[in-house]
Regions:
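Bacterial N-terminal signal peptides that target proteins for export
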Residues: 1-8
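Short edge beta-strand/loop segments characteristic of extracellular beta-sandwich folds
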Residues: 55, 211, 342-346, 706-712
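Sequence signature of WD/YWTD-type beta-propeller architectures
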Residues: 23-340
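Long luminal/extracellular ectodomains of secretory-pathway precursor proteins
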Residues: 120, 124, 137, 146-149, ...
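C-terminal functional module detector
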Residues: 348-365, 371-376, 382-392, 397-401, ...
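Catalytic cores of extracellular degradative/oxidative enzymes
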Residues: 449-632, 636, 642-643
Length: 840
């Protein structure tokens, strides 16, 4: 889970994209709402190989649904599904008109989401609304004359609109019926302006029930009822915390509303309420999600989407009675004929091996996945390189796809130690098999180096239901050896908390270790990782949450780290910085990492993480220059059950030189700094034969140091450098495709210093699905004449940091007692004294 400081978000993002070459931009960047990685996955429709959205036909016998980015029709009691659309974009969220003639749906194409209308009688498919905005959740009025939907056309914010439709065409412009309102509330995950989503019509068409966070700080809001006209009267009929997926549906009897809720539990299930709210009760049960419910026309059945088996699936529930059945497309009739293509991936030894695959149509840029695979996609991309975001899936070694005739780009990767394979394949009318053999770039485990992702969330409110078994499969496909599944709250719920035991997951193997640990959330001090916990999750798992009983800034992170260490934990800060704060210009931050670095309560920094790597590296370098020895770790912050995610499992990873793969030995080597962190380039670095984490003690005088460096990378880089005390002291020339280099560099040492090796690109570059490729080693420390490493300027930087932080903390309104405040201010004071002494 990502943390932003109080620096201006617009400035921060601008700095990030400028450094990344201003190429890579978020999917659907016209949405002007913060924390896009949450609403994009939890609210916006996504390409999934299983069903994602369902609507009933005119009667009880027919269902229409989205699947694989196209629309389908299937009889309730049938086994054959008929495809109704076939691109060129991705089609979602069908809703059938009351007379059964039209489907209105949302279609992602041309860098926007438009509304389209499909005439089920003639087959004519035509645009209904294309305004360059994101238009979703279309719903027909009961008389078939209007469509209610949600659009970002007003200033990029979520509002409900209505559109009059006559004879299959829009009649007039859309009308915004919800009123824009600046709440002035300190919302951490949501926009300051209220949002309005998920409309559903009353049976007489005069009112809507919808979801809004008006007046609330946490969650996407409660259930509201309003007149279906601009500025209509609106009242809240029920409140509970929701996160984008409530999606109420009003029964035609006018009395009942079905919706999806996680009230008091970790998973969404179906609940019933009255049209005035009443006292809702739970209708379905299970440790998985049931979402997107829709009443049948006579209110005797409910169709919905479930992820009970991992992937999304379509179900129908009888009410009353409770009989539940899965609607399975056992045979598929495609709108455009398709041909079977089988992909077989083998290791250098010729054995089948798991890998990550991507199949993209050259003509349309559209991605395809097997029917039984989880479709996943990057959440940002360069529009000059592709029409849609990069899509991929994990394969166990053999995967079969049904594809329209045409030319496809097949891309195969397996972590960072195997070369990327890219092939162009022509698909004709005959079934075919395409074989892919992967080649190694490096075999780091043979040298005692084992990769790990220190920041993974197995389940975090995404489309899919992940399990340790599937997480292990994902890790094997990414050639990842250690997975730290960090249990963390998503507002009130804490997915995966039931998996914590204090031990390795029993599905771990000799080459893949899974540990369930914790990310500690605070809306103030900065997020952190607690690894290797033996006894318990630290609860409550958050602090500084306004308007809750956890509003206090105590426990601060120092207290949390002490609690973690008391049970053998290893502690670190995660996804740190988007920019380097300049305190001389009045910039501020709440981030507490300098406190814990000074007090010795943290063991590593996530230098490669969900942040700007060069900015984080620059702050880390300042810290190293004060004499603090803190190694680099790495973590993706991968939401492993998402369909749209910022990075796949293992995108950001740390390689640890533990010799053998043993969890506790691996953590000990991490703490000792025997690491390098990367999202692409692989590094080897030694100084006078000593590797990262080591110290070289030399007498007073001038000394020659011999650096041996190596680079192997699946992605080209622009710079390959040796850094001493934050300054480049050796630049290694890169030739050819700039993915490999070996060199010996002579350096001179006359004073104490730390040395790292790094490689990076100055712009986003495929196949690294990050702001830009970057890697750095932890330092080798050189001590000359017993003198400490010191920079008074950098020490003063942290004194200024703590001065502004102390002032903010002192005036915080959430303290439970003066004793709490004094304890925390005391921690800041001790840390300030540490840096002040080094500033002299």
């Amino acid at each position: 889970m990502r943390y932003l400081t109080r620096a201006a978000v617009a400035v921060v993002l601008a700095a990030t994209w400028q450094q990344a070459g201003a190429q890579r931009a978020p999917v659907l960047q016209q949405i002007a709402v913060p924390h896009s990685y949450y609403f994009r996955e939890m609210y916006l429709p996504q390409h999934t190989s299983g069903p994602g959205w369902v609507t009933w036909g005119k009667d009880e016998s027919t269902l229409f649904y989205s699947m694989g980015g196209t629309l389908w029709r299937q009889e309730l009691d049938g086994a054959e599904a008929t495809e109704l659309t076939s691109g060129p974009g991705y089609d979602y969220q069908p809703d059938c008109s009351p007379d059964g003639r039209y489907l209105v749906y949302s279609s992602y194409r041309d860098d926007a989401v438009s509304l389209r209308l499909l005439d089920l009688t003639t087959g004519v498919d035509a645009p209904l609304l294309a305004n360059g905005a994101v238009n979703v959740e279309p719903r027909w009025s009961p008389d078939g004359k209007q469509i209610a939907f949600v659009s970002t056309v007003f200033k990029g914010r979520w509002h409900v609109f209505t559109l009059t439709v006559e004879q299959g065409r829009a009649n007039g412009a859309p009308v915004q019926i919800t009123t824009d309102h600046d709440s002035q509330l300190p919302r951490y995950y949501y926009d300051r302006f209220d949002h309005f989503i998920s409309p559903t019509w009353s049976p007489d068409g005069s009112e809507l029930i919808l979801i809004s966070n008006a007046g609330k700080i946490w969650g996407t809001g409660g259930v509201w009822r309003m007149e279906a006209k601009p500025g209509g009267k609106i009242r809240q009929i029920w409140f509970e915390e929701t996160t984008w997926k409530a999606r109420p549906d009003w029964a035609r009897d006018g009395n009942r509303v079905i919706y999806s809720s996680y009230l008091g539990r970790q998973w969404n299930q179906l609940w019933l309420m009255t049209a005035d709210g009443g006292d809702p009760f739970q209708l379905t049960y299970g440790d998985y999600d049931n979402t997107n419910p829709r009443w049948s026309p006579n209110s005797s059945k409910i169709a919905f989407i479930s992820n009970r088996d991992g992937n999304t699936s379509l179900w129908a529930l009888d009410l009353p009675g409770g009989r539940s059945r899965e609607i399975v497309a056992r045979t598929r009739t495609y709108k455009v004929s398709r041909t079977s293509l089988t992909l077989r991936v083998t290791s250098p030894a010729g054995q089948p091996t798991p890998a990550r695959l991507s199949v993209t149509a050259l003509e349309t840029g559209r991605g395809f996945v097997p029917a039984d695979a989880w479709a996943q996609a990057d959440d940002g991309f360069d529009r000059s390189e592709r029409r849609f975001e990069f899509t991929y899936f994990h394969s166990r070694g053999t995967s079969q796809l049904d594809l329209p005739s045409g030319r496809y780009v097949i891309e195969a990767t397996k972590g960072l130690e195997y070369g990327r394979r890219v092939d162009t394949v022509d698909v004709g009318v005959r079934s075919a098999v395409h074989r892919i053999t992967l080649r190694r770039l490096m075999d780091l485990p043979r040298l005692g180096w084992w990769s790990g992702d220190l920041h993974v969330h197995m389940n975090y409110g995404g489309h899919y239901r992940n399990t340790p078994a599937n997480l292990r499969f994902q890790a094997e496909a990414e050639d990842l050896h250690v997975v730290e599944n960090l249990i963390v709250n998503k507002e009130a719920r804490i997915p995966d908390i039931g998996y914590f035991t204090g031990k390795l997951d029993p599905l771990s193997t000799s080459s893949t270790l899974i540990k369930h640990d914790q990310e500690y959330h605070t809306s103030f001090w900065g997020h952190s990782a607690l690894l290797g916990l033996a006894n318990n999750i630290v609860l409550p798992g958050y602090a500084g949450y306004v308007n809750t009983a956890a509003a206090s800034l105590e426990p601060n992170n120092t207290t949390v780290f002490q609690l973690a260490r008391a049970q053998g934990g290893v502690t670190g800060y995660v996804h740190l910085f988007e920019a380097v704060a300049d305190f001389t210009r009045g910039e501020t931050t709440n981030h507490a990492f300098p406190i814990d670095a000074a007090l010795g309560t943290i063991d590593y920094l996530e230098v490669v993480g969900f942040a700007d790597h060069r900015s984080t590296e620059a702050v880390w370098h300042k810290l190293l220059n004060t004499g603090v020895r803190l190694p680099t770790g790495a973590g993706t912050d991968a939401m492993a059950n998402y369909a749209s995610l910022r990075g796949h499992l293992g995108m950001g990873r740390v390689f640890v030189n533990s010799g053998r793969l043993n969890y506790h030995a691996w953590l000990a080597a991490l703490k000792a700094g025997k690491t390098f962190a990367t999202n692409g380039p692989l590094l080897r670095f030694s100084l006078n034969g000593r590797e990262p984490g080591a110290e070289i003690a030399l007498p007073v005088g001038t000394h020659r140091l011999t650096a041996k460096v190596s680079l192997r990378s699946i992605v080209s880089v622009d710079s390959f450098e040796i850094v001493r005390n934050g300054q480049v002291v050796g630049s290694i020339a890169l030739t050819g495709d700039r993915t490999a280099a070996d060199a010996t560099v002579q350096l001179e040492a006359v004073a104490s210093g730390w040395y790292t090796l790094r490689a990076f690109a100055r712009a986003a570059r495929h196949p690294t699905l990050d702001v830009y490729p970057f890697a750095t080693t932890s330092p080798v420390y050189v001590v000359v004449g017993g003198q400490p490493i010191r920079s008074s300027d950098d020490a003063r930087y942290f004194v200024r940091w703590l001065d502004q932080l102390a002032e903010t903390a002192r005036n915080h309104p959430g303290w439970n007692s003066a004793a709490e405040r004094d304890k925390v201010l005391g921690d800041i004071s001790k840390a300030r004294a540490f840096y002040d002494e080094r500033a002299r």
